[in-house]
Structure formats: structure tokens, C-alpha cells
């Protein structure tokens, strides 16, 4: 079974983490976006791509019960919802295991792209549907620094988790 972390690593490789700022788990409480996104990719030019990772059909379907998605799927509110929730994104994608593609094509609005995680010998992301350009919003230097700060916080949290795991393993020996 494909895990979220497998897709995260493949996304980071695909978007080239050496050339772009890539930060996982950006929540709305951080004041950067109007909703939580699983991965945020910022180019050197200051344009953002958001990615939502789904690893099961139930997970994918549940995403459409979120407030921002309900507003987006309402034909009377679609444009307003796009501007409210997605105005900081140039592109937005769903990243899924390859076997979810038929369901994803049926559920995900056409302006969002779809990446499929291919878990053959070399694990990689395949662009199954190209995202349409949503907005041409250029992030300010202040926004970019804030995202980098969030990325640093993620690194710290991961290092602390590794440290705790190593200490537990040492105690078992």
C-alpha cells in the first residue's frame, strides 16, 4: 500500500527540492493559506503550486466534504471560492496512487491537475492531468520567508521525532 510519505518524497524529487522551496503540511492556522494543503512548492520567481495527497478512495472522497471544497463545487460560489481559497496558487494538484486515477478523474475538478505515484522499480510521479493556471499571484518576500520559517519548523519537528525514536531503540537494547 502506498503511504503518504512515499508520495511526499516523490513530489519533492519531481519538483526538485534543490531548486524550489517545498514545505509539507501548511495549515490555515499559520495564516499563509485559507485551508490546509499537504505540500506547497514555491519557485524562485515566487509562484506557488499546492498539492493535496490522497492515498485511498475513502480519503479522496472525504476531501470533498471539507468547507472549501463544498464551496468550490457549488456552481453559484465556484468563482468566489476559487478566489478565496486558491488565489495564492498558480497551480493546484492532487497526488494519488496510480490505482486511484479513475476515481480521481471523476471527482476532481478539471482545473486541478493530477499526479499519479508510480511504484515500479523507480518510484516517481506521473502527471496524469495537467493543472490549469488558477491565478498569477506572486508571493511577497515576506510570505516566502514565512514559508521557509515553517519549513524550518518542520525540520525541527522531524529531527525531534528521530531523536525520540533513537532513544526508544537504545532503551530496548
Language-model segment annotations:
Residues 11, 28-30, 39-41, 81-85, ...:
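Short, flexible, glycine/charge-rich loop motifs used to bind or transfer phosphoryl groups or to couple energy/partner
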Residues 49-51, 93, 113-116:
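Hydrophobic/aromatic beta-strand patches that form the interior of the parallel beta-sheet core
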Residues 55-109:
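Catalytic cores of nucleic-acid endonucleases
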Residues 19, 46-47, 89:
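A general structural motif
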Residues 1-35, 42-43:
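Acidic-basic catalytic patches of nuclease active cores, encompassing PD-(D/E)XK
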Residues 2-5, 9-17, 103-173:
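Non-catalytic C-terminal interaction segments of nucleic acid-processing enzymes
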Residues 37-56:
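Active-site beta-strand-loop-beta-strand hairpin of nuclease catalytic cores
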Residues 26, 54, 118:
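Residues at the C-termini of beta-strands that transition into short coil/loop
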Amino acid at each position: 500500500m502506498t503511504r503518504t510519505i512515499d508520495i511526499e518524497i516523490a513530489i519533492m524529487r519531481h519538483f526538485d527540492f534543490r531548486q524550489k522551496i517545498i514545505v509539507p503540511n501548511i495549515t490555515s492556522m499559520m495564516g499563509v493559506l485559507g485551508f490546509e494543503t499537504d505540500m506547497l512548492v514555491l519557485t524562485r520567481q515566487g509562484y506557488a503550486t499546492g498539492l493535496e495527497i490522497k492515498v485511498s478512495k475513502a480519503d479522496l472522497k472525504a476531501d470533498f466534504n471539507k468547507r472549501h471544497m463544498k464551496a468550490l463545487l457549488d456552481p453559484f460560489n465556484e468563482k468566489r471560492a476559487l478566489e478565496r481559497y486558491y488565489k495564492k496558487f498558480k497551480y493546484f494538484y492532487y497526488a494519488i496512487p496510480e490505482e486511484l486515477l479513475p476515481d480521481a478523474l471523476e471527482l476532481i475538478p478539471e482545473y486541478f491537475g493530477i499526479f499519479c505515484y508510480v511504484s515500479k522499480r523507480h518510484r516517481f510521479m506521473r502527471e496524469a492531468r495537467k493543472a490549469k493556471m488558477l491565478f498569477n499571484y506572486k508571493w511577497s518576500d515576506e510570505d516566502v520567508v514565512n514559508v521557509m520559517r515553517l519549513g524550518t519548523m518542520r525540520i525541527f519537528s522531524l529531527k525531534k521525532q528521530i531523536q525520540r525514536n533513537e532513544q526508544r531503540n537504545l532503551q530496548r537494547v
